[in-house]
């Protein structure tokens, strides 16, 4: 499946807001079948694990599913695995900047803490949700308290969300989703394939939200592909 860059630019030149809206509507429609399946397995599977490679729009997909379910009066909470990263020391920050720490490894996650919170969510216990500050490379507990009540759904999204070495909650409580980029972009007799589209997305995200230069993201991407391709 592919689309030409010229066609994309023509649609943007005609009406950029309409183009964005039509893309969103098309993706919403593709998610509707997934949402129907999620609803069919409730309340037995209150935890949705959503995974995919870096730059595959995991966060966007989770938020869209949350929005659809909320509009159906099914309270849904989207949480990112990124917020369960272990804080870095100053020494580790320097090592990471020099490419000597694998930032995509599941070992970056506080696995016991994560699973403890997930079990509490399943049981309806209150948890104080963490937040990872990528500019400071530190995790903090926020004032956001989550107490899942019966029929509430929790979406956990992240690269390692489907990794059994990371999340070990009972399988019968879990609904699994995997997302990835499938479309290529063609321009000047070249083809921008899904992995490179994901790289472009990641460069934009890292620059805006993670205090990371385009060059640094590019240097990291080969390492990232070991886990996400």
Where are these regions (language model features)?
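ATP-dependent NMP and nucleoside kinases share a basic, alpha-helical "lid"
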Residues: 156-201
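Conserved nucleotide-sensing/catalytic segment adjacent to the nucleotide-binding pocket
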Residues: 92-133
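Conserved small/polar residues in nucleotide/adenosyl-binding loops
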Residues: 227-228
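Hydrophobic positions on the alpha1 helix immediately C-terminal to the Walker A/P-loop
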Residues: 61
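Short beta-strand-centered segment that lines the nucleotide-binding/catalytic pocket of NTP-utilizing
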Residues: 72-88
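Conserved lysine of the Walker
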Residues: 58
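Charged, amphipathic alpha-helical linker segments immediately N-terminal to NTP-binding catalytic cores
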Residues: 1-28
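Hydrophobic anchor at the beta1->P-loop junction of P-loop NTPases
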Residues: 50
């Amino acid at each position: 499946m592919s689309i030409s860059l010229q066609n994309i630019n023509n649609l943007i030149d005609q009406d950029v807001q309409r183009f964005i809206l039509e893309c969103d509507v098309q993706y919403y429609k593709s998610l509707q079948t997934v949402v129907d399946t999620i609803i069919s397995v409730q309340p037995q599977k209150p935890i949705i694990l959503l995974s995919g490679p870096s730059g595959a729009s995991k966060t966007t997909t989770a938020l869209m599913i949350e929005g659809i379910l909320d509009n159906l009066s099914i309270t849904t909470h989207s949480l990112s695995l990124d917020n369960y990263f272990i804080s870095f020391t100053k020494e580790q920050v320097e090592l990471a900047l020099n490419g000597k720490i694998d930032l995509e490894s599941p070992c970056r996650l506080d696995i016991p803490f994560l699973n403890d919170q997930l079990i509490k969510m399943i049981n309806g216990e209150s948890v104080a949700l963490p937040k990872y500050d990528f500019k400071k490379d530190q995790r903090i507990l926020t004032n956001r308290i989550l107490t899942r009540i019966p029929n509430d759904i929790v979406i956990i999204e992240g690269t390692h969300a489907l990794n059994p070495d990371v999340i070990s909650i009972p399988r019968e409580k879990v609904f699994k989703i995997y997302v990835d980029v499938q479309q290529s972009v063609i321009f000047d007799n070249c083809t921008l394939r899904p992995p490179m589209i994901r790289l472009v997305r990641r460069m934009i995200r890292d620059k805006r939200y993670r205090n990371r230069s385009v060059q640094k993201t590019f240097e990291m991407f080969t390492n990232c592909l070991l886990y996400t391709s």
